Structure formats: C-alpha cells, structure tokens
C-alpha cells in the first residue's frame, strides 16, 4: 500500500515519468492494475484502496483523490476503497533502536484515531470525502462502487450511509466484533 501511495502522492516529484503530473503519478498504479487484471481475468474483482486525503502538508487532497478515482474507474477497476492519513511524513521520530510508526502524527490520527478518541468519536470521518469522491466518479459516467471505511461505529450508521447514497459499500471490522 505505502509504495503505490507514495507514487500517487502530490508530493511525488519524480522526474522519470512516474511523478510530478497526475498522469505521471497514476502511471505505476495503473500499470500494476493492468498486470493484475491480465493475470486474473475479468471474472475476478480487482480494485484499489487509496487515500482520500493524505492529511500532510503538500499531500494529495480529496480533490486529487477524486481525479485518481475517476482514472481508476476509467481503467476498469471493480471497486475503490478509501482511507486517509497514516503517513510517515509527519510521524514522530522513533527512539534509537525502535521502529518508525506512522500513526503518531496528525495524519496518523486521521487514519487510526482510536488512540486519542473517546465516546464522542470521531465517527465516520471518511464519509464526506468518500461521498465527494463517489459523486465525482458518478459525474464522470462510471458506476464503480466506492467503499467507505474509517470510524463507522455500527450497523445503523452503515445502513444509513448506504440508504443515503454516500457510499456503495461499507468496510469495517472491529465494530462487528
């Protein structure tokens, strides 16, 4: 995930055709998709999980993610799953001998807020970005399902999101335990 996310990032300034412009940043992820699709055929679902917002200075935003989503839908991906944050760019420096951990900075909080959240949330922190990205995909003429994840606190909220057309699928695990 992190390697391809690095290529998609607005911070990717590679000058070898795999960065700088949106087309350049999309090049490797689309090449990977084409290779996977070529191996598994059309009767196997292939999609992509990517960041709706990197939540770092100069990083990709929801507007960027909407353009990425449309490109992925155009390429034929079967679903688009959205997350956010969790970047090493703003993580705290590890102590000597310890591994770097991406969930210690502001973008980490956006990805894994349970470390400092409480009964007030944040709940459904990816709903608005996912809905905006889904709307962009639909406006471009694609019906590619969009998966919302992140802070969905239960089945009632998940059902409401589907009923309201804010997402096509809801991904959560911990909440169902």
What is the meaning of each model-derived region?
Residues 1-177:
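Flavin-dependent oxidoreductase catalytic cores
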């Amino acid at each position: 995930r992190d390697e391809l996310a690095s290529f998609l990032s607005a911070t990717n300034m590679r000058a070898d055709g795999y960065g700088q412009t949106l087309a350049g940043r999309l090049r490797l992820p689309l090449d990977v998709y084409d290779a996977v699709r070529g191996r598994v055929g059309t009767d196997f679902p292939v999609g992509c999980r990517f960041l709706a917002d990197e939540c770092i200075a100069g990083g990709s935003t929801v507007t960027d993610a909407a353009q990425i989503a449309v490109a992925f839908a155009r390429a034929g991906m079967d679903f688009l799953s959205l997350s956010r944050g969790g970047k090493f760019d703003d993580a705290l420096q590890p102590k000597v001998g310890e591994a770097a951990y991406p969930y210690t900075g502001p973008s980490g909080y956006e990805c894994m807020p349970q470390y400092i959240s409480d009964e007030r949330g944040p709940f459904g922190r990816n709903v608005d970005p996912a809905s905006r990205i889904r709307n962009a995909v639909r406006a471009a003429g694609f019906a590619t399902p969009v998966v919302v994840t992140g802070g969905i606190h239960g089945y009632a909220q998940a059902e409401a999101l589907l009923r309201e057309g804010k997402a096509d699928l809801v991904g959560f695990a911990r909440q169902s335990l």
